[in-house]
């Protein structure tokens, strides 16, 4: 099983070398040849990764979502893509459609757990979170720094046992 933290760090090292925050997952996706589009989606859908044989994958984001939600959804779909590349399933057809709600974060689906953890580590790398925490930066300021919601930041702080 792939380690989402290591995979996110590899992507950051290779494609986001300037270490500026917030990390822009759309720019990273484009540098990997992925198209990212926004469109009207059903309310229960937050995003999707769609791959047809012989065609580059497309990440679809819900056009009405808040910018921070779109960033996390994009990073999440990128996580699905990275897991496919690493498992050498690059040209097969596949589709991930991510639904909102409690069932999306229960931790029962390994692919979803990987994509969520990858997204969190891409947008909020552990070392930067710890650095800001040591400096006693307020949570809302940290969330702005990373371009995520305060809720996502608190989830990350809790995962690092900093809350």
Feature-to-residue mapping (PLM):
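Active-site hotspot residues in diverse enzymes, especially metal/ion-binding acidic/histidine motifs
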Residues: 1-163
